[in-house]
Every structure is written in structure tokens, then in C-alpha cells.
Amino acid sequence: MGCLFRTRPVEETYSKAPLKESTQAALIESISQQAQKIQSLQATVDIDTSVGGAKKGHVTDYKEIRGYVLARKPAMLHMIGLLPIVRTTAFDMVSDGQEFKLWIPPKNRFVVGRNDVQTPDSDQPMESIRPQDIYDALLIRPIDPDHDIAVLENGYEFLHDSKGHRVLQEDYELVVIRKRATGWTLSRKIVFSRVDLQPHRQYIYDEQGNVATDARYASYKEYDGVGFPSRIELFRPHEEYDITLNILKLEINKPLRDDQFALQQPPGAEVVHLDKPQSSAAVPLADSRSKR
């Protein structure tokens, strides 16, 4: 009958790194403790940004720029990016958790709107970015016992060893289900490395169960006695943009004033209201004042 089978090598092997054990309760508690330790942060960062993908048919990589990030609970964020070499402002954005403002000096555009207003087809890539999405990736929220159910899954991830070989490594995956007005929905998945039991990835889902944010965390360091990732990558698949923050300096729990999260409308700027129909969204400053 001839040979009915053949033997072939297995390409993936398991990582030989020593792995730590934990439990569902311990991982939930670690998220809560980390959240309690950080009430505010102020960071100097290098920002890498890419825009595009299958929908646009191409990807544009932007030159790395220096930036500053301020965050304060419960939902305040202020992020500034500086143009290379000249170090003038490339963008300036603030959010109070509900509404945001975005100032883009090179285009003389001042954008305002709610964080839940999406513009995925915008010809202005910066206008697809929402400060609230950055905030949610930056500071992992604790599990809310009144609204969340967290289920532990033993999973695995693909890594590369020191020789560049592809290996499998077991991880812990905390799947968070949230109670909403429409019922229970998939909210988040937090992936913990079994090497250090730190969150190394977080998926945030929309109410339809689609991945809204894919955040990766790497190179944890101690800042003011608190362990925090020095590299955070945020990918938004629907809007097709990717932002990586490489932290150069981080101060935790320093007092931050309300005026540090304020952004005034510059005189002469083109004002874009994303809450309005796109045909009437952009109005000159004089017109926007006359309609008040």
C-alpha cells in the first residue's frame, strides 16, 4: 500500500524561560493595586506613529518626534508632540474623558468634539486620534466588581528566543466581561507574561465585540517606586493608526493643576467641530464666533 504517512519536524518549540504561577484572584488584585498606586503621571516620550493599512492600501511611517504626556485620574490627558529639529509644536491635544480638543499648528486647524465621535475616513490622520484611547491604554483600569466579570484563560504567545527562533510561551489571559444596558459584552482581555506576571498586552473591545484597541507593554522599569512599562504601543485597527510611546522620563503622582489640561483656541485658526456634519464642520474663527 506504500507509505501512508510522513514525519516532519515541529517548527515551534516551547520557551525554556522559567515561568511563574498565579491565580485569577491574584492577577485581578495586581491590576487593582497597580491602578491605586498611580493617580497621575508626567512623561517625556519619543513618539513613533504609523498610519494606514489594508483599507487605505498603504502605510505611512512618520518620523519619530519628542513629546510630553500628562495624565490625571479619573480621565484627564494632555499630550504634546514637537516637530523634529526645530522643536516647535506638531500637535497639542487635551481631553477630560468626554470631550477633546486638538490643535495642529502646521495646518492651522483646531479640532473639537466628543471622544466617541469617529472619523476613520478622514484625510487628516491626526483627527482620527482620540486622547481617551491613549489614556485607556496608558493606565490599565482595575476590574470593577459591580460591573465586570473576569475569567482566567491559560493561553500562549509566540516569541523569539535569543537566537531568533520562534518559540511558544505560556501566558495568563484575563478575559473581562462587562454588564451594559444592552446586556453582558466582551470588554477587555489583559494578557500577563508568565515570566514576570506583568500585563504585556491589553485588548479593548467595542460594544459589538470588535477589537478597538490593541495595546502592548514592554520593558518594565521602576519609576518613583512603581513598576511601569517604558514602551507602550497602541494600535487602533478600525482607524488604522499605530502609536508607540518610548518613555524617556516619568514622574508618578506629582500634583497636576487643572490649567495643565487646558487648551485655548488660537486666534485665526480654522475650527473643526467633529460633532457636526462634515459639510459644516470646518468654519473660520470669525464665523464660529458669529454663530454663538
Q: Model-flagged regions — what are they?
A:
Residues 2-64, 276-292:
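N-terminal leader/targeting segments and the immediate start of mature chains
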Residues 5, 74-136, 269:
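An acidic-aromatic
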Residues 22-25, 104-186, 265:
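Flexible, processing/modification-adjacent segments and terminal tails
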Residues 30, 66-71, 93, 215-222:
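Extended lipid/amphipathic-ligand handling interfaces
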Residues 39-41, 65, 75, 89-91, ...:
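Envelope-exposed proteins and targeting segments
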Residues 45-47, 73-75, 81-85, 97-99, ...:
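A mature extracytoplasmic/lumenal domain signature
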Residues 47-92, 99, 288-290:
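Post-signal peptide N-terminal segment of secreted/secretory-pathway proteins
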Residues 150-268, 272-277:
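Gly/Pro-enriched, hydrophobic low-complexity segments
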